[in-house]
Amino acid sequence: MKKNKLLLLASFLMLLSVSLTACYDDKADIAFYSGDQLNDQVGTCTNFVSSVTIYTNSSSQTENLGIAYGKGGYQALSSDAEVVKVAIEGDRLLLTAGGKSGKATVTLTDEKGNQALLPVTCGTGAKEIRCTKQTGVLPIKDGQVQSDIKESVAQAMQNYAPMTAGGKYVLIFKDMSDIEKGGRLLVYKDAQASAVEGTFEYSLVEEGNRPRPRFTLTYGGETHVLEVPESGEISTDSRSGIAIIPFTFQENITSQFKEQNPKFTLPDGVEVYYLITAIIKNEIIEIQ
């Protein structure tokens, strides 16, 4: 289980990682790559790098890239050292955040005068979870929607909608390299809503066949616990593992349902969930 937990966390952190990889059809005169060794199979997605994003709210603010196809004797120059600083160590290019948010271009030159340009973006990183569909409230037992009471349950909770299509959660991490540290939260209930501030925490649910992500969101005097359901557990538009986009978030609201509808008796084993479909992506944001 510990191994599965680490693998899952690693998969999730891949969604937060620095933007590095690109696809190339042919070898360039000078190229950059991530990792220790170049994988340059023509016509495939390799570890070539066409641009870099460095998050200033990360414990790791330096990127170490390999240099391929050059002639040695490298020199590097940043168009704005306040955004990104550069250094050369043999055939490696070191990029370090300069402390200023923005974009810069790194120019690398070899001893033969060949050049390569690398766009770099630095800034505060966040994860945006944007709701694309409000599935709504569903009664579920053993992963199956209970169709016989579906409409009555939905009617009873018709006003429950903490997040709707077009809305989003913006998660500003304390450390983009360590999601478990949590961070600051901005909630936009819909596309026109103003931001409501709060905090979020991240953990893994150790139930079922594999650990699953859980976000505890606290804002506006309320706490909402969103989980990614076990793959195949709930049939919606998106069956999701951790790294599939879009995917489903679910919130167990059985307690709220019973409190608000004391005369409604749920069948044994049935729980009530609020579901949304979301797309996630990394963002560079302006801190207000």
Predicted segments, located by residue:
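C-terminal motif of bacterial Sec signal peptides marking the signal peptidase cleavage site
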Residues: 18-22
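Bacterial N-terminal signal peptides that target proteins for export
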Residues: 1-10
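Extracytoplasmic soluble-region selector
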Residues: 24-287
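Repetitive helical segments and hydrophobic/amphipathic motifs
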Residues: 12-14
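N-terminal start-of-domain structural block
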Residues: 2-3, 23-25
